[in-house]
Each structure stands twice: as structure tokens, then as C-alpha cells.
Amino acid sequence: MSLVHMNIALAFTVALLGLLMYRSHLMSSLLCLEGMMLTLFIMGTIMILNTHFTLASMLPIILLVFAACEAAVGLSLLVMVSNTYGVDYVQNLNLLQC
């Protein structure tokens, strides 16, 4: 495994650990999710370029489209929660609260 692949795998692991450890605030969770999507995009692009599999060159673009949709939904959810409760805690997303 080359140094570039190890760095990308490490970046994905750090983003995943950040998502698991700092899950109290919605903004930090969204940032970790975006970091994971960015590393998946870079890893997919590098793999496609290394294998010369040009038929799959559209897959990273599709991943970016889904990442943009996820970011838009996440930010709208963040705005809704912060306007309703005044804070961006993930525990405020529980619909079973009274």
C-alpha cells in the first residue's frame, strides 16, 4: 500500500472516529460526515485512475452529488434545530421527546 493510500485511509479513520466520539453536536457530526465523503471521493478517483477503468469515471461525480444532497439536508436540519431549541445538540433530534 502506498503512502497516499495510507494517508487517505487514515483520514477516513480519523473522520469516522470523530463521528463516533464527538456526536453530541450536530455541526461536528456533519463535518465528520463531509470528511468521510471527501476521502471516499479521493479514494475512488485514485482507484479509477490507477486501474485505468474509464467506464467507472462517473462514480466519483455521483458520490459528490449525494454528498452535496446530504450536506444540504444536514444544514437545513441544523438550522431547524438551532432555531427551535437554540442549540445544535443531536439529542434534540429525538422525535419521541415530549
UniProtKB/Swiss-Prot annotation:
Membrane topology field: Multi-pass membrane protein
Pfam families: Oxidored_q2
Segments passing through the bilayer: 1-21, 29-49, 61-81
The enzyme's E.C. designation: 7.1.1.2
Any Gene Ontology CC annotation: mitochondrial inner membrane
Localization of this protein: Mitochondrion inner membrane
Protein keywords: Electron transport, Membrane, Mitochondrion, Mitochondrion inner membrane, NAD, Respiratory chain, Translocase, Transmembrane, Transmembrane helix, Transport, Ubiquinone
GO biological process: ATP synthesis coupled electron transport
Keyword Electron transport annotated: yes
One Gene Ontology MF term: NADH dehydrogenase (ubiquinone) activity
Domain of life: Eukaryota
InterPro entries to which the protein is assigned, alphabetical: NADH_UbQ_OxRdtase_chain4L/K, NUOK/Mnh_C1-like
Chief location category: mitochondrion
Class of this enzyme: translocase
Subunit structure and binding partners: Core subunit of respiratory chain NADH dehydrogenase (Complex I) which is composed of 45 different subunits.
Similarity annotation: Belongs to the complex I subunit 4L family.
Role summary: Core subunit of the mitochondrial membrane respiratory chain NADH dehydrogenase (Complex I) which catalyzes electron transfer from NADH through the respiratory chain, using ubiquinone as an electron acceptor. Part of the enzyme membrane arm which is embedded in the lipid bilayer and involved in proton translocation.
Annotated protein name in UniProt: NADH-ubiquinone oxidoreductase chain 4L
Gene: MT-ND4L
